[in-house]
Amino acid sequence: MRIPPEESNAWIDAGTWHDALRDAPVPELRAITGDRTSPDGLLHGPAVAIKLEREGERRQNLLDAIRYHTVGNARWDQTGRALYMADYLEPGRKFLAEDRGFLASQVPHNFDGVFRQVVRFRLEWSVREGNHIFPETVELWNSLR
């Protein structure tokens, strides 16, 4: 899979920064984002994107990849899609290790197909667990149909 250097750099930066504030105190994340209603676990991505933007980051695709990496975004380019997949397929996760390992091995050969599968798996898990399905997630799924 050939990736232009500029895009490759965005993928690396997204992977490096997307969870930078994952363990930050919730009051700090709410202060950064101004968000008083979203679930705690969804605040770190937007907070990182806001901080990066304040520090001068101008690559909107990178900022959007990080901002929406927990819920998805139908308007993502390859950077957002790659981060969404990587976040789900990361080897350190305990669930469905074999299935995720197989999917990860297929990314270079079938990027869009694997992305669709990851979105489907994440959506199915949310439904099965009785979690709220965010509008961004629904819009992402519908954009892939």
Question: Model-derived features: where do they sit?
Answer:
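Charged phosphate-binding loop/patch that engages nucleotide di/tri-phosphates or the phosphate backbone
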Residues: E124-R145
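Divalent metal-dependent catalytic cores for phosphoryl transfer on phosphate-bearing substrates
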Residues: M1-R116
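Amphipathic, Lys/Arg-enriched alpha-helical patches that create a basic surface
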Residues: V114-E124
